[in-house]
UniProtKB/Swiss-Prot annotation:
Organism name: Haemophilus influenzae (strain 86-028NP)
General function of this protein: Together with its co-chaperonin GroES, plays an essential role in assisting protein folding. The GroEL-GroES system forms a nano-cage that allows encapsulation of the non-native substrate proteins and provides a physical environment optimized to promote and accelerate protein folding.
GO CC annotation, single: cytoplasm
Protein name, per record: Chaperonin GroEL
HAMAP family on file: CH60
Amino acid sequence: MAAKDVKFGNDARVKMLKGVNVLADAVKVTLGPKGRNVILDKSFGAPTITKDGVSVAREIELEDKFENMGAQMVKEVASKANDAAGDGTTTATVLAQAIVNEGLKAVAAGMNPMDLKRGIDKAVSAVVSELKNLSKPCETAKEIEQVGTISANSDSIVGQLISQAMEKVGKEGVITVEDGTGLEDELDVVEGMQFDRGYLSPYFINKPETATVELDNPYLLLVDKKISNIRELLPVLEGVAKAGKPLLIIAEDVEGEALATLVVNTMRGIVKVAAVKAPGFGDRRKAMLQDIAILTAGTVISEEIGMELEKATLEDLGQAKRVVINKDNTTIIDGIGDEAQIKGRVAQIRQQIEESTSDYDKEKLQERVAKLAGGVAVIKVGAATEVEMKEKKDRVDDALHATRAAVEEGIVAGGGVALVRAAAKVAASLKGDNEEQNVGIKLALRAMEAPLRQIVTNSGEEASVVASAVKNGEGNFGYNAGTEQYGDMIEMGILDPTKVTRSALQFAASVAGLMITTECMVTDLPKDDKADLGAAGMGGMGGMM
């Protein structure tokens, strides 16, 4: 086992804080409508230019191992915020930095770290409740557009496209982001169905650059059982090969000899095949297979109704215009199913939703309606260069996640105002169990001004002046850094999804609290390569003597 380097107390915290500040300072320049870009060097190809906080955070690795531990913990904040809400990564980083800096000052002054942490947790819990009270539902197309615009760094075209996409496929529908071919952003709505099952073998991949399987005008074989014997599949494979079309097999599972033979056939180019597991489990799987059958005008091959896979013909297979499969999802686009039958199936599922008493069942049934009736909207991102395309795709992706979060939990005033208002409301009444908890509460509430201050700093104004003016206002009154005007943030269209603001605060406080209570840090001692080389040389000399 390698020897370890151990640091205690203030020595450890100073190093950790340095790492926190390096990472947070790099990330926070991207915050707000006038946030700057960060250029990331890549080991191959052109550098990436981004305004996406989590992309910047992921690139940072520090040489000093103790500093790097601090940086990695803040990186965790950005990643968690990104996973939970898809946006708010920079806000979360700024909050974490503010809480850690304030907290470590208090620890250095002799406060008890555990009580400080309890105070911070109390403040965060109270502010989260207050944010829920301030939250308004996000329902109109205009509000959805505004949320999308803000999250795409004030790009109103992206906001409009997301709003239109949600209007076309419904708020539950599937919206994907792809590279466009021109300079303009476009919205393409395709009828289709997506489910969360990826390819059963990476050898099916025929588009290595995107690690996807794409099948044009494929047949679809739907089977309600495991397939392990290739003999059962031969009649269908021969029929499909003669027809010269690709085949997608959706079954409970494809394994052993059957899967191996399909892979070999695909690699030799004899027949273009892909296999995925059927979505869902038990009765839900049967229902979803039936949904796919109706969408593609196919038949589910099921032994329950006396059908045998060996006797299946091309007439039993469904058809679609295109199928795209990645490691996690399968999307069936433009099935040839009869419109009247699809509508009948949707009506039947809606009836089940009304009769269902379980929230979970209702949610799953609602998903099936969305997949049958909604279709897939594709936002095609246009740009002049590949570097710009990557940067823009990141922003569109963020905006899409933020909009979904807004529809889910509602919206609050943006620009850091909601946190300032919630903190002010809580400050009046919240008290800790002792004086040190009160200090924790105060420092957490003070740190909640950090996003507002950073947005103002990035726009080139004086943060203290603007923060003071906003604190003296009421309700949604705030500062629009894009136009440099004060006013009602919601009327000006500066909105943040409640979920994004809440997640950013909770994750930031969680990790910051752990860092404040750190007393010891342990890492590997760096290896002394020179000493090793010296020893090897001496050994050689010994042999010569």
